Amino acid sequence: MRRSFGIRVAACRFRQDNRGFYIDRAANTISDALTSIKHIGRRTAQKLFEWRERQYKTFSDLLADMEFDPAFDSQAVDILIRLGYFQEFGSAGKLLKVHAAFHEGEIRFSKAHIPATQQKRLTALRAFERSLEESGVPLAEQIRFEVEYAGAPLTVCERERDLYAVLDVDERYSPKLRLYSVSTGRTGVMKVKKPLFRTQPLKGGDMLRILDWQRRPAYQYIDGKPCPRPGVSELWLEAYEKI
């Protein structure tokens, strides 16, 4: 079944040139431009490209630089964290806590502070960041976020071999589902019989676990009669569980 899926769409990453499409031929992946993500503009994408060679010991240090640059706002940084853009600094769950502490609470950092206060707060933020354990976001929540803001799922989790996200549904004739494989990151099409689809309707953004499937010959109609297409097959869902 995996062979029926094609090239994988990967998430953008800090230090890549994501001003446009980024192709990794070795990994057989392609990343969309940062500007395709909701609330991420060209100025932000350009600035991140310019900063690609900068070295940061902690994520807090990067946030401090962002605080002084008008290309960044809290919402854009939050979205990029959730999409794994800054994964070199840690997991999304951990970085979200650092980001929250940076803007709220007793050790928040602001360009309005005097330099001595900024240095004191940054030292405290670095210590706070180092004290945190890695923590992720629930898988289903993460994928739904990716669909909403990036337009498609990006997360890959190899152990979830039967888990798929529904990208869109064509309900003409036997419904066709365009699916994203969470285990491989690839997309493909599966068909489902109408009676089964009516009992368990699906729409774009839903997630399902495939319980059974079959490969069957593809048919075409000639003079009003179904005829098999030589050498062509289709994947059919036989049983699934909506999550």
What positions do the PLM features span?
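Short, charged beta-turn/beta-strand-edge "cap" motif at the junction between a beta-strand
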Residues: 211-219
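Sliding clamp-binding short linear motifs
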Residues: 1-5, 10-13, 18-177, 186-198, ...
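Short nucleic-acid-contacting surface segments enriched for D/E, G, S/T with interspersed K/R
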Residues: 195-211
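Active-site cofactor/co-catalyst pockets and adjacent glycine-rich loops in catalytic enzymes
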Residues: 180
